Amino acid sequence: MINTIRIERAVQRLTQQQLAERVQVSRQTIHAIEAGKYVPSTVLALKLSAVFGKKVNDIFMLE
């Protein structure tokens, strides 16, 4: 699964830590998602989409 988390985070000028705090996960979880090493739960994907104001399928795509 590929994602645009790093890009969306840069557009909003958020650090990994700031994003992690907003969605209530660790900074390491955000790093793992950005690196493609971790696929987030549905709940986490929805929280991330809410932070960025985008649809889940605009942020996460199957390869």
Feature locations, PLM:
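Residues in the helix-turn-helix
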Residues: Q18, T29, D58
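Short amphipathic recognition helices of helix-turn-helix/homeodomain-type DNA-binding modules
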Residues: F60-E63
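Short basic helix-loop element that most often maps to the first helix and adjoining turn
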Residues: N3-R22
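DNA major-groove recognition helix of helix-turn-helix/homeodomain DNA-binding modules
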Residues: V43-D58
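Recognition helix of helix-turn-helix/homeodomain-like DNA-binding domains
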Residues: V25-Y38
